[in-house]
Amino acid sequence: MAEPRAVLKQGNRNRDKDSVGLGNRLRFVSISSALNPMTFSSILRHLQTLPLSKDLREKLQKRGHVQLSGLPRLPKGLIVSSLAQSLEKNLLVITATLEEAGRWTAQLELMGWQTVNFYPTSEASPYDPGRLESEMVWGQMQVLAELIQGHQVKGKAIVATEKALQPHLPPVATLREYCLALRRGQEMDSKSLELTLARLGYERGSTVETEGQWSRRGDIVDIFPVSAELPVRLEWFGDELEKIREFDPASQRSLDDLTGLVLTPTSFDQVIEPALNAQAIDLSAWGEDAETEQLFGKEGLQRFLGLAFTEPACLLDYLPTETVCVLDEPEQCAAHSERWFEAVAQDWSALQLPNLPQLHRNFSALGDRLKTDFQYITLSEIHEANGDSLDISARPIPTMPHQFAKLAEILRGKREIYSGLTLGQYSTWLISAQPSRTVSLLQEHDCAVQFIANPRDYPAIEKSQIQRTAVTLKYSGLAELEGFILPTFRLVLVTDRELFGQHALATPEYVRKRRRATSKQVDINKLSPGDYVVHKSHGIGKFLKLDALANREYLMIQYADGILRVPADSLDSLSRFRHTGTRPPELHKMGGKVWEATKNKVRKAVKKLAVDLLNLYAKRAKQVGYAYPPDSPWQQELEDSFPYQPTPDQLKAVQDVKRDLEGDRPMDRLVCGDVGFGKTEVAVRAIFKAVTSGNKQVALLAPTTVLTQQHYHTLKERFAPYPITIGLLNRFRTASEKKEILAKLKSGELDIVVGTQQVLGTSVKFKDLGLLVIDEEQRFGVNQKEKIKTLKTEVDVLTLTATPIPRTLYMSLSGIREMSLITTPPPSRRPIKTHLSPYNPEVIRTAIRNELDRGGQVFYVVPRIEGIEELGGQLRQMVPSARIAIGHGQMEESELESTMLAFNDGEADILVCTTIIEAGLDIPRVNTIIVEDAQKFGLAQLYQLRGRVGRSGIQAHAWLLYPNQKQLTEKARLRLRALQEFSQLGSGYQLATRDMEIRGVGNLLGAEQSGQMEAIGYEFYMEMLQDAIKEIQGQEIPKVEDTQIDLPLTAFIPSDYIPDLEEKMAAYRRITSIESTDELPKIALDWGDRYGMLPSPVEELFKVVKLKHLAKSLGFSRIKVEGKQNLVLETPMEEPAWKLLAENLPNHLQSRFVYSAKKVVVRGLGVLAPAKQMDNLIDWFGKMQGALPETKMETLVGK
């Protein structure tokens, strides 16, 4: 599910184009949520006016220290924010754990700070030889980048764990030397920039897609700073930096102009290594492993920080002095720190390097720094009655879901909330995701309460306060809020937890803000020498190389009987041969009979499929179903209470579903998206509409018990504020429970039932079933599928699947099979930290222990069942405290399901299994996966396995273990090195999902069609299916596979314009695979933006492509010169079709075109120069387009 990007500072909303200050130009670390950062601003204003707040301010300024106790988390944030903001100071909050820091950050974002930054730290030992995870380092750089420039930072809040107080950074002055400030208009040799970028650790490539990369094309340099949200494009005029612009990493298009930016190093190693070299320190004497260094480069130089610098720094060294520091729960911070200190001290001793400077300090020494250098506040939830501490004595509000009469009496002061405590004279605030409903429910019981939509409408809020009217504010964020009473401040706050019993739907976790090229559509047809390709006329061949001949470039394709040269501008007649088999395909002979026979056989099968699909669509169009009314206010309220920002894909899927429900024929829609991409929320909204707007019953069907449990809990939580009843039907229900559920379904007392295939049993009778939601239909058996098929004619059906469905298939079937695709990944998905290691029991023990220490669970995956029980025994010896479960495909289904459910419920810590890990299962606590013998798995398999972790926003780890390096082949070694570089949601991930898409086609279209697809390759099959559907729908212009242009033209991409071969191939692919000629100006703009002004051969290439596109759409297969005077258009079209086209030409031109069988002669055009011939044909073909059916016109020429 995609979380929103909260706009947390003015600089993000109205960005100041003239300021170089990093605060305005670079975005910093944030946990995003669908919230108004000013939600609590009116409560903060109110707190600041109270006498007790004034006393606390004076005490803090006079003594430099305030100690508060008796405070839960939310009032802690409110009180310290009001104090720091009234003193016009920044805020640093130190917590004991990462989880607590995440919660603090989510709450501070509601409290009016200009920026709220989470400063990420590692729980690992500073002496760990592994490299620090990039995401964490970049997150630190984002926070440090602003602080290091010495600008007057105002309105800034930073949250970190006590690890941020440990020495883990280079000195401030040293790091500042490694930061490069760039300004528009400054003189700088672009060559010296290259040297600086290398010094800062930036890697040069052909395209910039992710942090730490840079590329150069002439006078244009692209860089993705690790401390920024977007990459930047620098343009030079001579030695002057003329332009600085952000650009979108997905489209590579330029965006906003900037006046300046600051580049930080990509990691701290870039700062540490030169310091070590300057002192001529030989790292081999300090435990650096030569073999590891040879394979992966120098790793983890942070453990030598003390050798490089006599005084390593911590976060406090970088803070402005105008900062109030808050130590939250000092006892817990101390305990957590001391446990870490003891473990790390043992690691340091085990190194047996007594002269290696220590990078661990005990907590009391760290606390002294806080007390001497800053004003600081300590906070404790436990009531303390000592002289130094002020006990705020906060009280919780008892949870009383749906007891509005009782709550109204309490808020009016007519009933005691605790013995001797009434709230009649208290300032009362209600924070709710359903504010209008909350207000109306309380007003029914004579409670004075008002909803104020704008939390900064201070006059209206103050007026309500004077009139003793409770103020209700809207909130739908991620922070878990609990109501409280502050007797010392005479303030009470009530949340949805007390009103409806509704808990937060998710725990906020740290996510570094950035926009990466995750949405970038990877060019699946990107060809490399050695790839197998399919040519539409000749079949399967092997791509050898790109070759220049005369004025054009050609792809050399190896066939069984020789080499075929394909012009680069005809690249659309080729596609990569993609199939699911592992054996290389046999090469065809050029123009051979075998390929023609295969094509004809597949074409017949595809036509039959198209006819079947269209018949099914026609049948469904005649059925009549229940038409639901438009959305109710409750529907709007439920959707507003969703704590994440829905992605555009999600919103479109919801609109599609609602349109189906409000239509008068039964819905049968498929929603497709990976686990965690938000399919369930689409279903939640549909279910709610069916129950509340249509008074219908709903059944949600899932293939496994574990999934039913997850869906049941989601619905219970989302629908808590509403009078909706939900039942769960699976094999863990007792006979009496099942009997009660069945009776309530029959009588209509139960609105929703969630269950496995039992829901389809003959004993299940509904009073009025309106909607059936099916999760992963392809995983049900034949009998269940038949029952579902009969239900589909009677009720609305919504099917969810996590198997990717390719967009090409989606486009072909749109209008025939209702499908919605959710392809946008959630920004909260943190890239998984991948570790490569030779098999080592100590590495495994540490990885498991680290995960269990933070309350998580572990998948341990092996490639085979043999020896799995023994492995379980070995793990028990390594980690005696761990509870271990074992799961594999040869277990009884019920036993395997019980094991998975127990693991899901946290009854086991480690699941030792084969690759059967549940594809649709979402277990947020599993954040470490260990894969033994990683070299035995394919890349796509490893991606799928790795994708089982990292779902909750917590940093996940994947350990890929391989045998001793001497046993590895060179190929396996290279693959493992490449694996370490892959990012979970980057291009490699998309390539792996494309392999799964082929399975998705099989699931959707059946086994026979899968076989046809294997024969001719996936891409060509999809094209045939689209053509068959169009043909049956009545398009008369003949289809030609390619248009050959035999005119003496100079049309190609010169090597000095796009030097990189891979980029050049991608450029040819992009320009030749356009859907509409409208795309060409945009491509020309993009190329001009990225590579500079278009040279003449490239302009000619654009015209050739436009001509080909128009000619192909009109059914012309070849354009050639005939004699000295004429041009010939070869075509399979019949004369009536030609007459239809010719009618669209002006009268004076019609006589120049002469039709005869299989060709049209254009008289007199041959005497003109080739470029002029092309211009005339483009103009005339454009006129002929008017004869095409309107739908096809829109597809080809653009709407």
Curated annotation (Swiss-Prot):
Entry-linked SUPFAM superfamilies: CarD-like (SSF141259), P-loop containing nucleoside triphosphate hydrolases (SSF52540), TRCF domain-like (SSF143517)
GO CC entries: cytoplasm
Gene Ontology biological process terms, A to Z: regulation of DNA-templated transcription; transcription-coupled nucleotide-excision repair, DNA damage recognition
Keywords, in A-Z order: ATP-binding, Cytoplasm, DNA damage, DNA repair, DNA-binding, Helicase, Hydrolase, Nucleotide-binding
Annotated GO MF terms: ATP binding; damaged DNA binding; DNA binding; DNA translocase activity; helicase activity; hydrolase activity; RNA polymerase core enzyme binding
Subcellular localization: Cytoplasm
TM segment ranges: none
UniProt keyword Iron-sulfur present: no
Superkingdom of origin: Bacteria
Annotated S-S bridges: none
Domain Helicase C-terminal: 847-997
Binding site for ATP: G673, D674, V675, G676, F677, G678, K679, T680
PROSITE patterns recorded: HELICASE_ATP_BIND_1 (PS51192), HELICASE_CTER (PS51194)
E.C. number: 3.6.4.-
Root EC class: hydrolase
Chain ranges of the Helicase ATP-binding domain: 660-822
UniProt cross-references to HAMAP family, sorted A to Z: TRCF
Family listed: In the N-terminal section; belongs to the UvrB family.
Function (record text): Couples transcription and DNA repair by recognizing RNA polymerase (RNAP) stalled at DNA lesions. Mediates ATP-dependent release of RNAP and its truncated transcript from the DNA, and recruitment of nucleotide excision repair machinery to the damaged site.
Protein name: Transcription-repair-coupling factor
Species this protein is from: Synechocystis sp. (strain ATCC 27184 / PCC 6803 / Kazusa)
